[in-house]
Amino acid sequence: MLTAVTGINWGDEGKGRVIDLLAENADVVVRYQGGNNAGHTVVAKQQKFVLHLLPSGILHENVICVLGDGMVVDLEHLTNEIAQIREKGVVVTPNNLKLSKRATISMPWHKIQDELEETRLAKTGAAFGSTKRGIAYAYSDKYRKKTLRLGDLLHLKEESVQNRLKMMLEAKNLELAGCYYQEPMSYPALLSWCEAQAAELWPYIVDTGAYPVSYTHLRAHETGAYL
């Protein structure tokens, strides 16, 4: 059985609370899009958990959580979020958390752009109240094919990935210098950042598109519940 929860407003509809209630009876909980610009608070096991990227299904034992293809993922935020809930006794391993190799990475410059543009707009009273998490800019670059996907972290030593990273950085430096008079970012620093994130998250990165199919096949004799 597949259960879908979606919002019809601009957030704050209570999706997180509904998902937390439904997750108790789910086998797999999938977050298919979005980033860490908003979050939800869940009270479980007499503790408060504030989640921005992880589905609240992560708080339930035997529930597998998936961050899907449509996500834009702030890698540092995700690593910190995992560490924070582990400190409260929640088990997070590659067995119960799967990251789509096709999900988009929120690059360091996305938050920089968001901050600079919001500051520029504020001077004329036109600021729109961005969370400054870089979500819109990550999605924009996704559709412009000017960012990396999580799966690229597994191939950082390949020349094709490094060349793409260099081209992306060159274009972004021109954009930031021309629009906001920013100093250029260096390629070695950017590559080191990518390598550090890969070292933390590589065990979780899989082909989640194929995963539900194989999971269903393995449990063909049961009724799987997907949320």
Task: Give residue ranges: language-model regions.
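Single, functionally critical "micro-switch" positions that shape active/binding sites
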Residues: W10, R133-I135, A220
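Conserved small/polar residues in nucleotide/adenosyl-binding loops
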Residues: T216-T223
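Basic, polar low-complexity surface loops/patches
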Residues: M1-S100, T104-S106, I112
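Internal alpha/beta core interface subdomains
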Residues: L78, I82-Y215
